[in-house]
């Protein structure tokens, strides 16, 4: 029995898969093919009409994960049937995750919606092409938060297995599961913590230490470049982000080449202020081809940093598919932080989303 039929008490409407009672996922999200525009619109009309026939007294809320700012065809069609649509971005600085404030918003809204109208409301999940990696994380978060599935790693893997083999690799050049699991563990703490999420700490990201040199060239070495993306906590720009740090911007001298034969440890000084959701990328500069190759990526939230250090091995990093052999046994990346006492911890930023409130959101 697959995960999406585990709570299957009756046949769901055509075009939908049942995740839980009155919670459905559009089956187009699992397709590897592009549905022609005309067929796609017909498909949406038929699905929503059948839903209305099956649940005539229900209100419908659809979470849509998409790219861009324009109103989507999905939203335009669902509005015709008096449904409420909430649009979310399908990535955060290239990582198929949402910032913690949006995850909190999603959990709160879905919970309130399902509890409304004497538990008659219906929740729908939809993603536009390319949005499956994030949708898989969102579905796992929903299952963990509502205690419909246990074990963060097992739940995340089970949801990803529902998609056709190779879909995740097709849509994401890096394996996003390590960062997704980290954020799923954040979500799981909501069920046991009286304050969730905790205040986002303002920290100084002091340095990154690589222990045992990964092999990214013919000399078993690398020229590491660090880039850091996040929210500028000195502005009132809400969820907007930008590059906070880049090795290339800071250093005018040529990047140093580190080889396994010469050293065991690389220490890269950064001294960058961070707060909230942060994406840290480490790239290798290949001088032969004059291009940058992604070594690893990690996304984290400063609210959950303990003892001012984030310790990661190859299993905890988002890396290119089939590249684990580049990281020797015992490889470790350490991200060291310092306190920034001049800035007070703040709550997550105000969430501003594209929402059509037909009937109003809770």
Task: Enumerate the predicted regions with their spans.
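Cysteine-based protein phosphatase catalytic domain of the PTP/DSP
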Residues: 2-123, 135, 145-157, 166-170, ...
């Amino acid at each position: 029995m697959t995960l999406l039929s585990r709570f299957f008490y009756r046949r769901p409407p055509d075009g939908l898969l049942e995740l839980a009672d009155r919670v459905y996922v559009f089956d187009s999200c699992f397709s590897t093919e592009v549905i022609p525009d005309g067929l796609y619109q017909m498909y949406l009309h038929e699905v929503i009409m059948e839903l209305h026939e099956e649940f005539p007294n229900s209100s419908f809320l659809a979470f849509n994960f998409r790219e861009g700012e324009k109103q989507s065809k999905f939203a335009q069609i669902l509005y015709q049937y008096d449904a409420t649509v909430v649009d979310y971005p399908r990535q955060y600085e290239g990582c198929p995750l949402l910032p913690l404030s949006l995850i909190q918003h999603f959990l709160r809204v879905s919970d309130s919606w399902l509890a409304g109208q004497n538990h008659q409301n219906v929740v729908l999940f939809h993603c536009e092409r390319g949005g499956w990696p994030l949708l898989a994380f969102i579905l796992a978060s929903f299952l963990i938060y509502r205690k419909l599935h246990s074990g963060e790693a097992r739940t995340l893997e089970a949801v990803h297995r529902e998609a056709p083999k190779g879909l995740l690799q097709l849509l994401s050049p890096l394996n996003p599961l390590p960062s997704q699991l980290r954020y799923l563990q954040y979500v799981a703490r909501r069920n046991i913590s009286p304050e969730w999420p905790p205040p986002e700490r303002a920290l100084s990201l002091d340095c990154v230490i690589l222990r045992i040199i990964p092999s990214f060239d013919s000399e078993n070495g690398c020229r590491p470049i660090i880039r850091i993306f996040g929210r500028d906590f000195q502005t009132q720009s809400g969820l907007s982000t930008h590059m906070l740090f880049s090795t290339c911007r800071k250093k005018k001298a040529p990047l140093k080449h580190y080889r396994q034969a010469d050293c065991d440890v690389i220490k890269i000084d950064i001294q960058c202020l961070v707060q909230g959701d942060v994406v840290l990328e480490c790239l290798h500069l290949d001088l032969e081809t004059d291009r940058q190759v992604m070594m690893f990526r990690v996304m984290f939230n400063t609210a959950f940093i303990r003892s001012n250090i984030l310790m990661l091995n190859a299993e905890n990093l988002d890396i290119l598919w089939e590249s684990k052999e580049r990281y020797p046994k015992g490889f470790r990346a350490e991200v060291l932080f310092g306190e920034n006492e001049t800035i007070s911890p703040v709550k997550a930023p105000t969430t501003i989303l594209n929402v059509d409130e037909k009937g109003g959101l809770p």
